[in-house]
């Protein structure tokens, strides 16, 4: 992105530490033979080369994230990822068909949203890409919660947001920037809805809340790097005070939930690196933290 990335963009490159998951010793590690399969519906009456480029960039980014995801977490079943024309900007997971649908209109909407605040097509495409990947991982969380019957507490939509952000900021390529782009999309959407009646009954938190929840986790992960979020007034000091604890607690919770579903290939790689017995290596892997 260019120098006009906005007040919540990362000032530094993402950390490259590997995401691994710990769980209970004695659990059987999952076999990651399940796949994500992609399908693309043809767009009808589509015009606009800029939106087409944005959709292509976002599609490529989703493919990259899927490859990284498969190294870390086993899928409960094959999941079909469908890029489709839906008639409105949306994304969703269908628990009956095990399909994640990303609507072209949603990607277009992200591009148009960021076009109003960012200069240059590269910056706009990168922001739309980040927001798309962020919401895609949100839908992946729904699939994992469904398939592995994860005993989450609280609202599932909030838990899905947490999973998306935590996965991105813990070693995913360009993960910090993508998480912050997702946060910024919530902020911009909230601004567009200013003056409208809020739907407090919706399963999702309000866009303003999703914005602050996301940047709180980003800040809590690396407060020294993102201290500027407090300086420029983006993150209120009273909320920032709780963010490190929030990150640690939620990070540990997702480690516990997903530990038994650590991808087997990731386990094998770690086991070879330890140069010890398989059982000892397995215990070491399961103790490894997200950090």
What is each stretch, according to the model?
Residues 2-84, 290-291:
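Hydrophobic or amphipathic, alpha-helical segments that drive membrane association/targeting
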Residues 13, 17-39, 198-291:
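Pan-zinc metallopeptidase signature
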Residues 55-119, 125-130:
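Auxiliary, metal-adjacent structural segments of Zn-dependent hydrolase domains
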Residues 78-92, 161-162, 177-193:
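Acidic helix-start/capping segments at beta-turn-to-alpha-helix junctions
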Residues 125-145:
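Short alpha-helix carrying the canonical HExxH Zn2+-binding catalytic motif
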Residues 129-134, 156-158, 180:
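Alpha-helical scaffolds flanking conserved acidic
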Residues 153-172:
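An active-site-proximal "capping" alpha-helix that borders the catalytic cofactor pocket
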Residues 169-221:
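Active-site/pore-lining binding-face segments in mid-to-C-terminal subdomains
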């Amino acid at each position: 992105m260019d120098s006009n990335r906005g007040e919540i963009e990362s000032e530094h490159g993402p950390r490259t530490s590997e995401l691994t998951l710990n769980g209970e010793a004695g659990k059987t590690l999952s076999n990651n033979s399940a796949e994500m399969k992609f399908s693309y519906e043809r767009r009808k009456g589509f015009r606009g080369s800029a939106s087409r480029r944005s959709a292509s960039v976002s599609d490529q980014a989703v493919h990259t994230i899927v490859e990284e995801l498969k190294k870390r977490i086993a899928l409960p079943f094959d999941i079909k990822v469908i890029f489709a024309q839906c008639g409105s900007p949306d994304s969703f997971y269908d628990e009956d068909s095990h399909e994640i649908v990303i609507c072209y209109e949603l990607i277009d909407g992200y591009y148009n949203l960021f076009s109003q605040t960012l200069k240059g097509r590269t910056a706009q495409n990168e922001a739309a890409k980040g927001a798309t990947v962020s919401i895609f991982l949100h839908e992946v969380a729904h699939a994992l919660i469904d398939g592995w019957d994860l005993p989450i507490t609280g609202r599932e939509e909030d838990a899905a947001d947490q999973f998306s952000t935590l996965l991105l900021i813990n070693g995913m390529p360009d993960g910090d920037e993508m998480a912050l782009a997702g946060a910024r999309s919530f902020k911009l959407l909230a601004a567009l809805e200013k003056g409208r009646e809020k739907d407090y009954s919706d399963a999702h938190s309000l866009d303003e809340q999703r914005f602050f929840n996301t940047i709180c986790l980003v800040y809590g992960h690396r407060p020294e790097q993102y201290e500027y979020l407090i300086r420029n007034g983006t993150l209120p000091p009273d909320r920032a005070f709780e963010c490190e604890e929030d990150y640690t607690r939620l990070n540990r919770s997702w480690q516990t939930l997903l530990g038994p579903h650590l991808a087997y290939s990731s386990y094998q790689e770690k086991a070879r690196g330890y140069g010890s017995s398989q059982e000892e290596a397995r215990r070491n892997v399961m103790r490894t933290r997200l950090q």
